[in-house]
Regions:
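Metal-dependent phosphohydrolase cores
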Residues: 1-196
Length: 196
């Protein structure tokens, strides 16, 4: 696999994906358009689609941001953008990531520039990781047959998720893509205004 330094050193802009707007996202020279990201994230179903209703990466990201805000786990904008790289590399279920170590390298190639572009910490904060874990269990309780009862988690996550699962601000709506896109963009606007 080509390493990030070699990839970014390439002068030619031949490694790209076409975006929903007809533009090009150059893998070795990434630039970020929030509307393009929102569209892609809204059209990707989490859990490899194995949920009772369509549930997007965009809606998940809003939930993580709300968890960070209401539970005082850190900057909710980080929560909103924590899976932003998936707009360009797709969401892959965690067990596959164990078997695909190069996926993490590819993710880092997009995530580093994305975090810099949006003025986020270089790596995920512990608060964002906690909110992501909580979201996982809140989502599973509402969208999966198993309710995640047999899943493992860091200490305290399952108990905390159980405590907050019925709070209205953490409700999972299972929005269709167009609504999920709008939901994400509204949250982005609100949080961007608060950061200004």
């Amino acid at each position: 696999m080509i390493d990030a330094a070699t990839l970014y050193a390439r002068e030619e802009r031949d490694l790209y994906i076409e975006t929903v707007k007809g533009g090009k996202f150059f893998i070795n020279h990434p630039e970020f358009d929030i509307e393009v990201m929102a569209h892609a994230m809204a059209h990707q179903c989490r859990y490899t689609g194995h949920v009772s209703s369509f549930y997007s990466v965009a809606e998940h990201s809003v939930l993580v941001s709300k968890l960070m805000e209401h539970l005082k786990l850190g900057d909710p904008f980080e929560g909103l953008m924590h899976d932003g790289a998936e707009a360009f590399i797709s969401d892959i279920a965690a067990p596959w990531k164990v078997l695909l170590p190069d996926y993490k390298k590819v993710e880092a190639m997009i995530e580093g520039p994305l975090r810099k572009h949006f003025n986020l910490p270089a790596t995920l904060t512990s608060g964002c990781k906690e909110a992501d874990w909580l979201a996982l269990f809140l989502e599973a309780k509402q969208l999966m047959v198993s309710k995640a009862d047999a899943w493992t988690a860091p200490p305290g996550i399952k108990d905390r998720a159980e405590e907050i699962k019925n709070l209205p601000q953490f409700r999972v709506f299972a929005l269709e893509p167009a609504a999920a896109r709008a939901y994400f963009l509204q949250r982005y606007k609100d949080l961007s205004n608060a950061r200004a």
